[in-house]
Amino acid sequence: MAVYTDINEIELGAFLRHYDIGTLTSYKGIAEGVENSNYLLHTSSGSFILTLYEKRTNREDLPFFLGLMQHLAKRGLECPQPVVRNDGAMIGQLAGRPAAIVTFLEGMWMRRPTVAHCEAVGEGLAHMHLAGADFPMRRRNGLTLPDWRPLWNLSRKCADTVERGLVAETEADLDFLEKNWPADLPQGVIHADLFPDNAFFLGDRLSGFIDFYFACTDILAYDVAVCLNAWCFEKDFSYNRTKGAALLRGYTSVRPLSEAEANALLVLARGAAVRFMLTRLYDWLTVPAGSFVVKKDPMEYVRRMRFHRQIESGAEYGLEMQGVAA
């Protein structure tokens, strides 16, 4: 979460008159994040999150994102729930931006996730996949295999200034992924960005997921692969197999992977590393200093890419055979 668009109390008060959430007592910007502007609201009825959607978020996608949160909450998944306006809509306009209010989710994200946190996230992700199975809307993943080569071409010319040899490495990975990307795996609603800062905990207990603004319809096991990249590498870039095994055990205890999904895990994990390297690399090379967009080091994911090239089976990530459906 972040703040890119400032709002004042007068315009916020006018906006809140369209909601039945009590009287505003205080509000403050939330500094973390990269995509949209977020504020924590305190009212006489409780706490809420106000989001102003910035240019990177397509307004046409908002009904999918908000509808998904509404659907998942109704299915018992802990996540922010959109607050419906007095006119029945979920989206309004504030400071020239589309804006929405969602309920506040208790908890905090873990900067140093433990094995228990990884297992809880895996279990929660599987519950999310099952809860989203009957969600009627679809949204194409705008950052999947067909999109990686065009995105890479925007950065390719300068990539070797970040790391010598990165052009050759990335070209080889893209060639491999384009030849080996799996077809006909189970698909459904995925989070697609379930990093530690998008999962809240109360102690070791998962209290819920947030930030569904990359959610889309895609391969379910790809979501697992994103989590292996996001949760199971240490600060020195080594892969923690114990955390990986816990995350996979948590997931497969709720939704066992098919044999085809298990066999594809190393390709999916390699692809997920490339996806996040490419978006980080693009921002690293193109976003000017002082911009509101928070740049993240692409080399963290280059090192993950190198690790995945050495993997020969899902077992090396910690996948146990009892987690694979017969």
Swiss-Prot record:
<comment type="similarity">
    <text>Belongs to the pseudomonas-type ThrB family.</text>
</comment>
<dbReference type="GO" id="GO:0004413">
    <property type="term" value="F:homoserine kinase activity"/>
</dbReference>
<dbReference type="Pfam" id="PF01636">
    <property type="entry name" value="APH"/>
</dbReference>
<dbReference type="GO" id="GO:0005524">
    <property type="term" value="F:ATP binding"/>
</dbReference>
<dbReference type="InterPro" id="IPR005280">
    <property type="entry name" value="Homoserine_kinase_II"/>
</dbReference>
<dbReference type="InterPro" id="IPR050249">
    <property type="entry name" value="Pseudomonas-type_ThrB"/>
</dbReference>
<keyword id="KW-0028">Amino-acid biosynthesis</keyword>
<keyword id="KW-0791">Threonine biosynthesis</keyword>
<keyword id="KW-0808">Transferase</keyword>
<dbReference type="GO" id="GO:0009088">
    <property type="term" value="P:threonine biosynthetic process"/>
</dbReference>
<keyword id="KW-0418">Kinase</keyword>
<keyword id="KW-0547">Nucleotide-binding</keyword>
<dbReference type="InterPro" id="IPR011009">
    <property type="entry name" value="Kinase-like_dom_sf"/>
</dbReference>
<dbReference type="InterPro" id="IPR002575">
    <property type="entry name" value="Aminoglycoside_PTrfase"/>
</dbReference>
<protein>
    <recommendedName>
        <fullName>Homoserine kinase</fullName>
        <ecNumber>2.7.1.39</ecNumber>
    </recommendedName>
</protein>
<comment type="pathway">
    <text>Amino-acid biosynthesis; L-threonine biosynthesis; L-threonine from L-aspartate: step 4/5.</text>
</comment>
<keyword id="KW-0067">ATP-binding</keyword>
